Structures are given as C-alpha cells and as structure tokens.
Regions:
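Conserved short hydrophobic patches within well-ordered secondary structure
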Residues: 21, 27, 46-47, 53, ...
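Short, low-complexity, Pro/Ser/Thr/Gly-rich segments in the mature regions of secreted, periplasmic
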Residues: 162-185
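Extracellular/periplasmic head regions of type IV pilus-like filament subunits
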Residues: 65-156, 184-185
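N-terminal secretory signal peptides that target proteins for export/translocation
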Residues: 1-6
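Membrane-proximal N-terminal amphipathic helix
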Residues: 39-67
Length: 185
C-alpha cells in the first residue's frame, strides 16, 4: 500500500504569523525613532531661530537701532519687531509666536558708568505652546525647549511696557533682576 505524502512546499500559518509580528515590531521601532528624530530637529531649529533673533538684536544695539540700557536695567525687544529684519514669522512647528511671551532682553550688568557689559536673554513661545522660559544666551540648547505635551509648567513673564521687573537668573540662590527701561514692541 502506498502512502500519500503531501508535498510540503511553502510556510505554515504559524511561520507567517511570526514573520508578521516581527515586522510589526520593527516598524514600530522605526516610526518611534523617526518621530523622536523629527521632534529633535524641530527643537534644534527653534534654538537656531532664537539665536538668529539674538544676533539681530545684538546688531541692532551696535547700530543704534535699539537702545543700550543703563546700568542695571534692560531693553526688551519683542519678536514681532525682530521678525521684520529676519523674515521669520512662524516657529518650526508652523505656528506664529506669542508676541507677549517672545522677546529678547538686553541687560547691562556693568558696574561703572564708563563701561558697558551687555548680556542677552531670550524667551520664546508659539501658539502651539512650544516654549522656553527666559534663558541666558549661553544656555540655549535643545533640552530647554518644551512642548504642549510636556508636564513641565512654563512660567514666561509677559512684557508689554517699560517699568516691568524681570528675573533674569535665579540660580545660585540670589536672583538677578532688571527693570525694563525700554520696550521695543
């Protein structure tokens, strides 16, 4: 008696399912990695844009377009004023900047009347709630940019006129503050 043996060619259902599961896991990892890469690229662009705004204000102070602050005071330049010279109107996230919370601060930390020692600070916020609080120029980096899905609470001081007091740096126990002597908004 002859036994009919099936000619086994191809894959079993279990083997096919295993391959599909492995491919799904690999795709999930790839998509997650790509999203993180895109988000980091947007944050880097956010910081680069902030640096361009700072450079524009630094040039404006040098050229006399913006007022050099007196000792211990600061000049605040709103982003909407800087946008005119840089051409940047939207954040990397595709939304306009919040005018009241996006500005450059020029602080004169000089000790004597005959010297000028300027420090530059920046605060940015867009209408999608991607932001960073008032930060010294040297501290601008990707890790300070937060987004709307962040659990970190943002406390950006709104500036709209002269006379406001800004806290520039509170690290080290003592706070550095300045009074806004000029507002370019």
């Amino acid at each position: 008696m002859k036994k009919n043996k099936m000619n086994q060619k191809g894959f079993t259902l279990i083997e096919l399912l295993a391959v599909i599961v492995i491919l799904a896991i690999l795709m999930t990892l790839a998509v997650t990695s790509m999203q993180r890469y895109i988000n980091n690229a947007k944050k880097d662009t956010y910081i680069t844009t902030a640096q361009q705004f700072l450079d524009s204000v630094r040039l404006g102070v040098t050229n006399g377009d913006y007022e050099t602050p007196d000792i211990g005071s600061c000049t605040v330049v709103a982003i909407k004023n800087i946008e005119k010279t840089t051409g940047t109107k939207q954040s990397p996230y595709g939304k306009p900047y919040n005018d009241a919370k996006s500005y450059v601060v020029v602080y004169n930390k000089a000790q004597a009347a005959q010297e000028t020692s300027l420090e530059y600070y920046m605060s940015m916020d867009d209408s999608l709630d991607n932001w960073f609080v008032l930060t010294k120029e040297s501290g601008l980096k990707r890790s300070i940019v937060f987004s709307r899905d962040s659990t970190t609470a943002g406390n950006i001081t709104e500036v709209s006129a002269t006379g406001a007091t800004l806290t520039l740096d509170s690290s080290g126990g003592t706070a550095t503050t300045c009074t806004v002597s000029s507002f370019e908004g």
